[in-house]
Amino acid sequence: MSREFSLLRRSVGPVEPSRLESPEEPPLRTLLHLSDIHFGPKHLPAVSAGVVELAAARRPDLVVISGDLTLRAKPVQFREARAFVAELERIAPVISVPGNHDVPLYRVWERLLQPFGAWRRHFDRELEPVFRDDEMLVAGVNTAQAFALKGGRIRRRRLAEIDTLLAEAPAELFRIVVAHHHLIRPPGVESEHPAWNAGEAIARWGPGRVDLVLSGHLHQTLELRPFGEDGFLALHTGTTSSSRGRGPESGRNSLHWIEIGHGSFRVERHFWESQSGRFEIGLDQRFRRRPPR
């Protein structure tokens, strides 16, 4: 049995809420997780405006964007994405990592020589940002690459850097890793290969090390726990504001609202409802936190 298949076989669902602290307990931190915004021909302006409205109403402590802010990494798409992120930054800090669509596709020389030049000009020269406060550590991983059109890769250098970040962080911090590409091939999606070195990342971020891995790329929402309750939750957001939803989420847009508590964390899956013109909760789950070690 392959390691990948065994991980999927051992994945489990949410922990029963009755075994955790009261859902009414005020959260320590709140996050808004977005992905696959895709400014360009497939972008839905009304939906991205709804994202800003939700953020303004709920005031997260941090906004996390796991890549693909553009469709084809064109200058106009980056300018539109920058304006969108600027609106969010007026509400909360924003941490984002590139996706494969944020690397130029047809501008071959730029792709080979400066694949992240446009990203750095519009967002941050740091492609793998880190956010840290008294309650959480969020580490970005750039899985996009110049020499692959779709697939991703986790660089071993970054794995070593995250090892150091985790070792130096206080044990009680809630630990989050953000990457565009997925670590585990989801059931029934045979064409989507995990990022290179995903198996090594899973092993390094296993029980007692990381609480949550946030990703996108698949354009479907998904939750997997490769080590059961003792390990991290791999949480995928679908496409937040484009018409490129896939599979059962074709034509749908999603995001996640995350509340970090003392012994657990809550994940609200939101879907855009065109009739109401806003994001509404489609699923509300609570998961056990990693015990401090």
What do these predicted ranges mean?
Residues S2-A86, E161:
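N-terminal active-site segment of His-dependent metallophosphoesterases
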Residues S22, R79-E161, A169, R204-G206, ...:
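Extended active-site neighborhood of metal-dependent phosphoesterases/phosphodiesterases
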Residues L34-S35, V63-D68, P93-N100, N142, ...:
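Active-site neighborhood of phospho(di)ester-bond hydrolases with catalytic His/Asp-centered motifs
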Residues G40-H43, L71-P75, E80, P98-V108, ...:
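Active-site environment of divalent metal-dependent phosphoester hydrolases
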Residues H43-V47, V76-F78, V108, I154, ...:
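Residues at alpha-helix caps and immediate loop-helix transition turns in enzyme cores, especially N-
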Residues A171-G188:
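Short acidic, glycine-rich surface-loop motifs adjacent to enzyme active sites
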Residues E190-H262:
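Conserved beta-sheet core of the metallophosphoesterase superfamily
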Residues I260-R293:
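A short C-terminal boundary segment appended to hydrolase-like catalytic domains
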